[in-house]
Amino acid sequence: MSSYIIAGKADDPSFARAEYAAKQVLALYPNIFMRFEMKHPDEWRDFINSICRKYDFAHYPADFSGPLVWTLEGSLIGGSADFVQAVCLEKFGIKDLPSVSDPSFKHMAADNLKQVKLDHHR
């Protein structure tokens, strides 16, 4: 079973696109595992630095804006575009995904940020 972790800032349309693409994969392949690590923008830098140290993704700079995708086993996939290309398109055949500039991803990112803020206050 393939397992992926997709991490990103809640307000990032690129993360929203990766999340959307992953859900398209899950709709066709329910045995795939996808975990979403949606972080408040203020938490992102500390989070991504700890992930890069933990998995030895040393070539990512401290100010990497994300998103970042890796396997549960710790193999780096890359950023959102790498995930869409290598996993969604090439491995699972998901085609016709909207580009990151599609307005729906800005709306998803705004909704994600609202959710993270709500979760933060609980």
Regions found by a protein language model. Give the residues of each.
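Short amphipathic alpha-helical molecular recognition features
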Residues: 10-13, 61, 75
